[in-house]
């Protein structure tokens, strides 16, 4: 699959998340404290709330609706009410841009 240009690296603050819509899908793009970038599905697996409105801390994203918790580096569901993992996508940076490989 081709790499898709999602945003500039500076569009995402350290330890933060932004929403990225591509086609008919919504994704969440993250930047960790060590400046690594990650991408997951953008909607919580519990009630389809936008994760970009959630709180990011220590490589985790907290859903803004019911406080479910995911590890955004691997998509693992960490705290109820979420029990289904998030899908993750490969990310790389190139020439100041964040690129995502979608399936």
Predicted regions located by residue number:
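Zn-dependent metallo-beta-lactamase
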Residues: 1-22
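Rieske [2Fe-2S] iron-sulfur-binding domain
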Residues: 16-103
């Amino acid at each position: 699959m081709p790499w898709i240009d999602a945003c500039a690296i500076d569009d995402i603050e350290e330890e933060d998340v932004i929403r990225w819509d591509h086609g008919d899908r919504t994704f969440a793009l993250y930047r960790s404290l060590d400046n690594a970038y990650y991408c997951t599905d953008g909607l919580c697996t519990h009630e389809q709330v936008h994760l970009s409105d959630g709180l990011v801390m220590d490589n985790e994203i907290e859903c803004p609706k019911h406080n479910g918790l995911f590890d955004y580096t691997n998509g693992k569901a960490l705290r109820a009410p979420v029990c289904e993992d998030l899908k993750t996508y490969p990310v790389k940076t190139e020439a100041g841009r964040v690129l995502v490989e979608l399936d």
